Amino acid sequence: MISVNDFYPGLTIELEGEIYIVLEYQHVHMAQGQATVRVKLKNLKTGNVIRKTFKSDEYVPQAFINKREAEYLYKQGDEYYFIDNESFEQYILTEEQLGDAIKYLKEGNTVSVLFYEGNPIGIELPTTVVLEVVETDPGLRGDTVSGGSKPAKLETGLVIQVPLFIQIGDKVVVDTRYAKYVERA
């Protein structure tokens, strides 16, 4: 059990039978009442983000998550196959377990597979990934009325805003936290 006063970003907790990671926390001191802790939590199984308020004297169970480096191999049906980089053991995760992470998965990418009580429950992506542009409008010279960006569909199906000079076939670096273009690869 861990006190809600000891929360920090990245801490994993168990709440109502689900595993959450703390994204943000804030101590709130009331003038006439008990202090509270407001937190922003992300469900590791579904990817949903919730906000919750705890009384400052509450305790919650801490979830101990193990991480193993693994390479993404392939997709078969709604199952995604990974191989451990050290033990060469294969892990199978479903589309539901991966959530939005599937938009960044490309065969050969290395990710961290998250384990809770010995079972794989999800993955942690690297901060950036390199993906190829497969569909985008041609950028016209001097056309900056639209803010200097245009939509581009990447090889995984993800659509992001890219600068006008990006063409089909270009490889771009994408920030996986915000689904944003970083630079040309």
From Swiss-Prot:
Pfam family name, one: EFP
Superkingdom of origin: Bacteria
GO BP terms in the entry: peptide biosynthetic process
CDD domains named in the record: S1_EF-P_repeat_1, S1_EF-P_repeat_2
Chief site of localization: cytoplasm
A GO term from the CC aspect: cytoplasm
UniProt entry keywords in alphabetical sequence: Cytoplasm, Elongation factor, Protein biosynthesis
Associated pathway: Protein biosynthesis; polypeptide chain elongation
Protein family (similarity comment): Belongs to the elongation factor P family.
UniProt xrefs under HAMAP family: EF_P
Protein name: Elongation factor P
Organism: Dictyoglomus turgidum (strain DSM 6724 / Z-1310)
